[in-house]
From Swiss-Prot:
Keywords assigned by UniProt, alphabetized: Electron transport, Heme, Iron, Membrane, Metal-binding, Mitochondrion, Mitochondrion inner membrane, Respiratory chain, Transmembrane, Transmembrane helix, Transport, Ubiquinone
PROSITE patterns reported in the protein's UniProt record: CYTB_CTER, CYTB_NTER
Protein task: Component of the ubiquinol-cytochrome c reductase complex (complex III or cytochrome b-c1 complex) that is part of the mitochondrial respiratory chain. The b-c1 complex mediates electron transfer from ubiquinol to cytochrome c. Contributes to the generation of a proton gradient across the mitochondrial membrane that is then used for ATP synthesis.
Protein's cellular compartments: Mitochondrion inner membrane
Protein name per UniProt: Cytochrome b
Cofactor: heme b
Residues the record lists as binding a ubiquinone: 201
Cofactor note: Binds 2 heme b groups non-covalently.
Gene Ontology biological process terms from the UniProt entry: mitochondrial electron transport, ubiquinol to cytochrome c
Pfam families from the UniProt entry: Cytochrom_B_C (PF00032), Cytochrome_B (PF00033)
TM ranges: 33-53, 77-98, 113-133, 178-198, 226-246, 288-308, 320-340, 347-367
Xref: Gene3D superfamilies: Cytochrome Bc1 Complex, Chain C
First-listed, main subcellular location of the protein, grouped into a coarse class: mitochondrion
Amino acid sequence: MTNIRKTHPLLKIINHSFIDLPTPSNISSWWNFGSLLGMCLIIQIATGLFLAMHYTSDTTTAFSSVTHICRDVNYGWLIRYMHANGASMFFICLFIHVGRGIYYGSYTFTETWNIGIILLFTVMATAFMGYVLPWGQMSFWGATVITNLLSAIPYIGTTLVEWIWGGFSVDKATLTRFFAFHFILPFMIAALAVVHLLFLHETGSNNPSGLNSDADKIPFHPYYTIKDILGMLLLLLLLMSLVLFAPDILGDPDNYTPANPLNTPPHIKPEWYFLFAYAILRSIPNKLGGVLALVLSILILALMPLLHTSKLRGLMFRPITQSLFWILVADLLTLTWIGGQPVEYPFIIIGQLASILYFSIILILMPLAGIIEDKILKLS
């Protein structure tokens, strides 16, 4: 008798995706972050659902409802901090996942890569709207500053901003619609993740060597299921340590003050995972230029397949590009630090230099290094 998992219409799909999936035998722990992102999404949807049961999206009661969740709801504090810090874990996994894709040349799977970029934008939009919901000072002013950037769009900008706000400022209408979008988007992310996997399974996974691994495949279960579970346990350990010992370490103290349109905080800044993009935005003195740089800082990923000049796929055997990759990582950490600093000397110039370096490495230096390495290896 054939196994039910191979014949049943629904189980068959799961079997081909997670059980009998042929997987390269040499993929390292950097390949764990896809499944970790899946776990993060499940945690966020589960905790978010329970938070939504007690939250009210009204400017007069939003802040109080979050306080009520933390004080009066059974384990409400746990759910709230798991959700807030779960977002940080989500972005840590996202950045590593994208970094792995760049390092090992996974962007050559163009469809998978492009869906991934759409996923990144969607997750960023969801996180931004979620940050507005507690209706603290940084929620309100963050929403005001970031939505206001759209007014830089010529001709339709101002109309567009007021349309998003649902009025002439960030107010009740804005909060209500942000809550609605924040609730629906994670389900769209889940659907996109399925499409992401669908395209990945058309080609099969990449591997650290960048070579074709068809000759050496192993079943996903039990080898990689057990490996993924180990990764999940380690991530849960990190998340729960954060939640139980230092839940506010990544948050902004200003968000414990209820939103007040009459009082601007001295330093308006987004959550830590947006600081690199915020630093790039601020490094250009022109509003429209800054907005374009902000969008391009992420959209530049879509150019990766076109900018690939080397005959070799990954960076495993390419020391020059390897060095550039790690300089890029250091540069992004520098930008993250600058994004959290006030706009004054020397931070302005450091931010501008780091922004120039960011675009130069991706657009000019890495493609050049690829050509040089091919010449050295006599591949061209």
